[in-house]
């Protein structure tokens, strides 16, 4: 053992425990029934599979645990840091329950091997004075395999976790059920369980006085429905994940837990044999048939958990707090929120220490304090910018100073600001999933924001944000702000390597590929790769596709790529934002304007000849959509009249139903004046 210190690991754990007791370097906050515990995420993740799955990457945060764990959670936390678990006959059941639901296998093993002072015979005799001991019913006839029946009943009663508990374990507070479950059929089993159960005390005794362990994460279906006097006992730990989500092997091997029906009474409820016998045979005997999410193909034990999971795809939060208006995916999350004294928090006020002014929110007080101090809490270390929130400072450091984004994709190494953006990127880019589906037309979007934009633009025709310079309308204000930069010349995104600035983050990302040499877009027909998607589409259209299949339905010009057609149609909409300062000639692309300016430099008094149909502007939005459709989809109507008339070269006499600008005239069939405007009426039954 040269060069090693045997007690090093013990000393490190002791120091961590001292830090926990002093609250030093603790990055985890655990709220258990109003009691707050500080701990280290690394220690929690090492000892509990629950915490490891909840925050697998070790990021900080706070977790709210069931109030029923308040009395014994301190014992488990001490066990995490010291390895010692203070068990007694009084707290053994609660510690075992918490250890199972938090998935602490070492604590579960200690609880199962714990020997209480009260014998099993005395405990069984105190609970019921009737019937023979459960161990005597070994030779009874069996209708199903004993091990499977034992697993179902024990798991439903909260005695065994999903992976079957060792048979030697028992609880001093409850009747022993293992051999009973092995030897009896479902109907006779329920009868003996009723005999072994503790009888109900008088009705004036409160339910809180009974030894009924609380179920912190009960499913919504476990609540009373329509005044019924029965409910389903669902014993299941449900974290922030997808409830009863099962992996592929587990979906095959796991059996459905028994649907034991319980009747409410003032004490420990007894099992109802009649209700159990009335169940369908497939629920009592058959194996569980997992239900699958049609969007992401995850599997669940029940339709309820699938219903809750689907809300993540739709964004629905049906459970709203009546006091503060906060919404949740699941009802149990709302109940936990209400249990944390929502009303008391909403009535809390924050007072300024300087002028004694009161505020309802802490953020409002922070904003107010800036008027006294003149300084915001978060300052940029590279420039003089200040921010009220940490996330704003983080975004500023990434956009302007080249700080790395915290969440990297393990497949392509692309980084994101939030974990949600990373998950959506992996689903869309690497698995080809578009998880958000429009209920009206079936359109699929890769993000919830994209789906909302689709609904507003296509089904609601909502474009409330209008540009004050060119009257172009947008569905979102962020898109308008991005568009305004084309008029103001603002370029807030700067490359931290060469200092070049850009209008959008996407443009900066494309530019960064010139430094890194990355070419993420590859051609499926050859080995050529590209830095952008547009050049890839043009390459495929020009090199690997024959003919020019895409043509404009207004002027008849043909194109190889549909992107080229879309750019061309903008000319018919009048979108020419690059204007020559010498002659006023306008272009759709800046490269065309630069090429035109070179002609002015070489030729004096250059006056470009107006090309036919160059400035034909269609005011009707539907006509632009018609222009992008293939000819087979067009119906006989004014749109075809326009195309035919343009081909013949005489517009005024052929379009009696159209409106021509009064100031325009034709000098000949080969030349068209610059500002001919057509407002077309598309038939209502045209599918646009």
Swiss-Prot record:
Zn(2+) 6 binds at residues 580, 583, 596, 600. PROSITE patterns: BTB (PS50097), ZINC_FINGER_C2H2_1 (PS00028), ZINC_FINGER_C2H2_2 (PS50157). Zn(2+) 1 binds at residues 293, 296, 309, 313. InterPro entries: BTB/POZ_dom (IPR000210), SKP1/BTB/POZ_sf (IPR011333), Znf_C2H2_sf (IPR036236), Znf_C2H2_type (IPR013087). There is a cross-link at residues 143, 263 (Glycyl lysine isopeptide (Lys-Gly) (interchain with G-Cter in SUMO2)). One of its GO terms (cellular component) is nucleoplasm. Keywords: Activator, Chromosome, DNA-binding, Isopeptide bond, Metal-binding, Nucleus, Phosphoprotein, Repeat, Telomere, Transcription, Transcription regulation, Ubl conjugation, Zinc, Zinc-finger. A zinc finger (CCHC-type) spans 319-344. A zinc finger (C2H2-type) spans 291-313, 350-372, 378-401, 407-430, 436-459, 465-487, 493-515, 521-544, 550-572, 578-600. Zn(2+) 2 binds at residues 321, 324, 337, 342. Zn(2+) 4 binds at residues 380, 383, 396, 401. The C2H2-type zinc fingers mediate binding to the telomeric double-stranded 5'-TTAGGG-3' repeats. The last C2H2-type zinc finger is required for telomeric-binding. The two last C2H2-type zinc fingers are required for CIITA promoter III binding. One of its GO terms (molecular function) is RNA polymerase II cis-regulatory region sequence-specific DNA binding. Pfam families: BTB, zf-C2H2. Interacts with EP300. The modification Phosphoserine is found at residues 169, 171, 179. The keyword Manganese does not apply. Zn(2+) 3 binds at residues 352, 355, 368, 372. This is Zinc finger and BTB domain-containing protein 48. It comes from the Eukaryota.
